[in-house]
Swiss-Prot record:
Belongs to the IucA/IucC family. The lineage of its organism: Bacteria, Pseudomonadati, Pseudomonadota, Alphaproteobacteria, Hyphomicrobiales. Pfam families: FhuF (PF06276), IucA_IucC (PF04183). One of its GO terms (biological process) is rhizobactin 1021 biosynthetic process. Disulfide bonds: none annotated. It comes from the Bacteria. InterPro entries: Aerobactin_biosyn_IucA/IucC_N (IPR007310), IucA/IucC-like_C (IPR022770), LucA/IucC-like (IPR037455). GO terms for molecular function: acid-amino acid ligase activity. This is Rhizobactin siderophore biosynthesis protein RhbF. Pathway: Siderophore biosynthesis; rhizobactin biosynthesis. Keywords: Plasmid.
Length: 601
């Protein structure tokens, strides 16, 4: 008779904790759906709101902020039953009841609830393991903090991870902090492509990753299958991807020797928030590995398009040259660009021939080598993803407040310093060079010393950098093969991209947290941001025309909606291209809104 031990994490499925995290996620669903105008919200009296959907009625308490965003009190959620109110705490039941009445297709509703359920399970595990105070969180490095953050704050299904089973979830997600060994394959040069910076080779990168002894054993295994480094490249692959995608879908190539399983490396890795990007914890200075995992998570399947994998290195080389030429970025800001130094892509012999095939089928086997943050840090420096600034410890103290105390600064002084470190390099890349970087909480890392913000690090270039469609001399030398892959869009879109990824997706949540927990009012928060931008612009009067082109001080900007993409515009369609964002109306620009309100008063 087979005996099974309880595989569930103790505490994660207790009724009390489940209700707690359920209420919190339901509050987030209501906040983000209201923000994206999935449904309307009526203010009955100051701080009290109501949702009316056909015969359904829900009530809650909330505070409204400058982006027309609500911060909902999870304990205040009630559903109207006749003449009485019943407590509301189940986000899955809420969505099952509400979404069909809003015109969401049944298939989409079912899949959305599935994805929301996965997110809720993850939230329960995070809550069950939570043990660190704000001060303890402030002492973590960037790798450890990846296990404490909770995914994109604006995506309600931020940890949907469709494709992972529960054992996969425990083994491969950042919040579970389970070290992973990377698998290595030999891949035929007839099917695989490798592009790296000029000084790098596939053999050299693999030696660095696994060591000389392990590299030699890989060569011996290749030789046993009739291959060598002349006929095959070596490629890292995620263990989940090998089991679920490579063996089933590339079986003929394995049988023919086009793909040769070489074994595991010795180093241990931990996943970042994207799940598929792995940080080396045995040797943190070694490259991080961005791998394919064909799971659906936060809008897309997490593969790597071949055209991007093979242009990442040329873009990195060009960006390094740009940084070296720009004294403001390199010397004054000390900006760190975590380069994608090499990329690989393996072509599937059948899927690649099908015109219009869903994109996931052509992004199953590839990788990128990216700089680790550790390799760029100076003595005494540490790093935290910007996403960490949206969190508080078990004692309720925000990480920002703990860092301010550690640095000997007030929260206001620390926040002003944060803006001076983060905003100028991001805006300078745009105004001076015509490049918009996606500086959201997972792509941007704050480098600190003794808790004080010092520098900024950016990553994820080939996927997220956008080039202005105007002919800027600063970007004229961008290689054509790179320009062909990057989005090239008008100036208005680029400025909205930065306003969205940094101001809405990071500072919107940070300002609410500090307003509620640390006594820094929202108007003061945005006043500090405004002052930082004006000081930067004053520093470069010769760029006045560029500042007019990329105007940060317009009255309003478009309201980006990512949850609506899942619910209405794309759903769970398996298309040949990735979904694009939706926009619904405009939001006030907080850099000018408070001045306008005070002047009007």
């Amino acid at each position: 008779m087979l005996m099974h031990h309880d595989p569930l994490l103790p505490g994660a499925f207790s009724e009390e904790l489940w209700q707690q995290v359920s209420k919190r996620l339901l509050a987030k669903v209501i906040e983000e759906f209201a923000y994206e105008r999935v449904f309307g919200v009526v203010e009955e009296k100051p701080g009290h709101y109501r949702i009316d959907i056909d015969e359904l009625q829900y009530r809650f308490k909330a505070k409204r902020y400058v982006f027309d965003n609500l911060s909902v009190d999870p304990a205040s959620l009630f559903k109207r039953h006749g003449n009485s109110d019943a407590p509301l705490h189940d986000p899955l039941a809420f969505c099952a009841e509400v979404l069909p009445k809003l015109g969401v297709k049944p298939m989409t509703v079912a899949h959305f609830i599935k994805e929301l359920g996965n997110t809720l399970v993850s939230d329960a595990h995070i809550a069950a393991r939570a043990s660190k105070t704000g001060a303890e969180l402030a002492e973590l490095d960037d790798i450890c903090m990846e296990g404490e953050t909770t995914g994109h704050p604006w995506v309600t299904v931020s940890k949907g991870r469709i494709g992972l089973g529960y054992s996969d979830y425990l083994a491969f997600t950042p919040e579970n902090r389970t070290p992973t060994e990377v698998l290595w394959l030999g891949v035929s040069k007839e099917r695989a492509s490798f592009i790296a910076e000029e000084t790098l080779t596939n053999e050299g990168l693999v030696r660095e990753a696994v060591g000389v002894s392990r590299f030699e054993s890989f060569c011996a295994k290749l030789a046993a299958r009739g291959g060598s480094v002349d006929t095959h490249y070596m490629m890292p692959v995620h263990p989940w991807q090998w089991d679920h995608m490579i063996v089933p879908h590339f079986a003929a190539d394995i049988a023919a020797g086009h793909i040769v399983f070489l074994g595991k490396g010795d180093d241990l890795y931990l996943p970042q928030q994207s799940v598929r990007t792995l940080s080396n914890i045995s040797h943190p200075e070694k490259s991080t590995l961005k791998l394919c995992m064909t799971i659906l998570n936060t809008a897309v399947y997490r593969g790597i398009p071949g055209k991007r994998a093979l242009t990442a290195a040329p873009l990195t080389t060009w960006l390094d040259q740009l940084l070296a030429r720009d004294q403001f970025l390199s010397e004054e800001c000390g900006l760190v660009l975590l380069g994608e130094r090499a990329g690989m892509h393996y072509v599937h012999p059948q899927f690649s021939t099908i015109e219009g095939a869903p994109y996931q089928f052509n992004e199953m086997l590839g990788c990128m080598w990216r700089d680790s943050l550790s390799a760029h840090l100076k003595s005494g420096e540490t790093g935290l993803p910007l996403a960490a600034l949206l969190h508080a410890g078990t004692d309720g103290k925000p990480v920002v407040q703990a860092l301010a105390e550690k640095s000997g600064m007030t929260v206001s002084e620390w926040t002003a310093r944060l803006f001076d470190v983060v905003i100028p390099p991001v805006f300078h890349l745009l105004a001076k060079h015509g490049l918009a970087f996606s500086a959201h909480g997972q792509n941007a890392t704050l480098i600190l010393k003794n808790g004080r913000p010092e520098r900024l690090a950016l990553r994820d270039f080939i996927d997220d950098v956008i080039v202005c469609d105007q002919a800027f001399p600063e970007s004229a030398t961008l290689p054509e093969e790179v320009r062909a892959v990057l989005l090239c869009l008008p100036a208005d879109f680029l400025i909205h991209f930065i306003q969205t990824t940094l101001f809405i997706c990071v500072f919107r949540y940070m300002s609410v947290l500090l307003d509620q927990r640390s006594g820094l009012p929202e108007h003061a928060f945005w006043g500090l941001a405004r002052s930082s931008i004006l000081a930067y612009q004053k520093r470069f009067p010769e760029m006045a025309s560029r500042f007019a082109t990329f105007d940060l001080f317009g009255d309003e900007y478009p309201r980006l909606c990512l949850n609506r993409v899942r619910l209405f515009t794309h759903g769970y369609a398996d298309d040949d291209e990735r979904p694009v964002p939706d926009f619904q109306g405009m939001v006030d620009n907080p850099l000018v809104a408070f001045d306008k309100r005070s002047n009007a008063a």
